[in-house]
Amino acid sequence: MQGELLVQGSKNTALPVLAATLLGKGVFVLHHCPKISDVEHMLEMLEVAGCTVGREGHMLLIDTRQADQYCVTGNGAGKMRSTITLLGSILGRMHRVEIPYPGGCTIGKRPIDLHLRGLEQLGAVFEHCEHTLKGQAEQLHGANIYLDFPSVGAT
């Protein structure tokens, strides 16, 4: 993977980009990344997955070359909604995933069924456990996925 991306400095931009770094094996540099708790929790989960993370001001360095842990827990794992963005990246790289159910939403109940249904159409299989979501995808494949309604997060 190669290229440049100007990150806007918002958590809603930074968190999916951080999760996407797991799709490649290399060192990724992200500029203008906000220093807020959700970003720090995501960095902790990337470290649990085996990444090396460094920060210089608002610049992040993510080294994903050694990432090999599919079970992503940690202090922030179940505390924020964006944990769900790790599902596809970890499945794509490691072919299995285990994460706590996402939390942290004060808006109200926000189901994750669109995320799961989309990944199932790509070949993933999920098992719902009491506190965690487990998934496997031996061979992911392309698919046309149609959402019941527009969803920025599910996209």
PLM region spans:
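Structural preference for solvent-exposed beta-strand-turn elements
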Residues: 1-155
